[in-house]
Design a protein with these regions (language model features):
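Ligand-binding pocket segment of bilobal, Venus flytrap-like solute-binding proteins
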Residues: 7-88
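Hinge/capping helix and adjacent helix->loop/strand transition within the periplasmic-binding protein
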Residues: 1-42, 91, 104-137
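Short N-terminal micro-motifs specific to bacterial/archaeal maturation
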Residues: 34, 53, 82, 109-112, ...
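C-terminal lobe and pocket-closing loops
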Residues: 62-131, 162, 176
Length: 177
């Protein structure tokens, strides 16, 4: 991308992917203009078809395309390699330890939801995640079946807000409400 900055662009479908790519740009000096897409599948397809130069995307739509040889994975975000792509280095191994980003999904309830209801929902969710069949299916889709208490999850969210605030400011990113 540095060799042809006039053609440097990247696909993104969410603030998470945009912020992660902008972090990579800030740490490497790489140029690139964001091209918006509606979803991860469209992002990967845009790279396969040569419409965009690169993307940072989640595992479910990406891993099958990498394994099929339709796109080349240069690195996985984070400090460790993915067990689904053991030959692909981590960002840390590639020389960018500060591009340690882990995407997560969460389950939210309305503010003021009674603690007993939250506990019931959490118990049911954890039972599903702990089911070996569900866990194996999630892992096969490149989804890490984690789990956190509401307090731990709040800490994760607050940490990410702190971690990425400078990226959003420096890259002058604007997101719709």
């Amino acid at each position: 991308m540095k060799a042809h900055p006039d053609k440097a662009n990247y696909a993104s479908s969410s603030p998470a992917f945009t912020i992660t790519t902008e972090l990579l740009k800030l740490k490497t000096g790489m140029p690139g203009t964001m091209i918006p897409y509606k979803g991860s599948g469209e992002m990967i397809l845009s790279v396969i078809q040569g419409q965009t130069a690169m993307t940072i995307a989640d595992g479910p739509p990406t891993v099958p395309q990498v394994k099929a040889g339709k796109v080349k994975a240069l690195a996985v975000t984070g400090a460790e390699r993915s067990p689904l792509l053991p030959d692909v280095p981590s960002m840390t191994e590639a020389g960018f330890p500060s591009v340690d980003v882990h995407l997560w999904s969460g389950v939210f309830a309305t503010t003021g939801t009674p603690p007993a209801v939250v506990a019931t929902l959490r118990k049911a969710l954890n039972q599903s995640i702990d089911d070996p069949g569900v866990s194996a299916k999630l892992k096969a889709m490149a989804v890490d079946p984690g789990g956190a208490t509401p307090d731990q999850f709040e800490h994760i969210i607050e940490g990410d807000i702190t971690k990425f605030a400078d990226v959003v400011k420096t890259a002058n990113l604007k997101f719709e409400d």
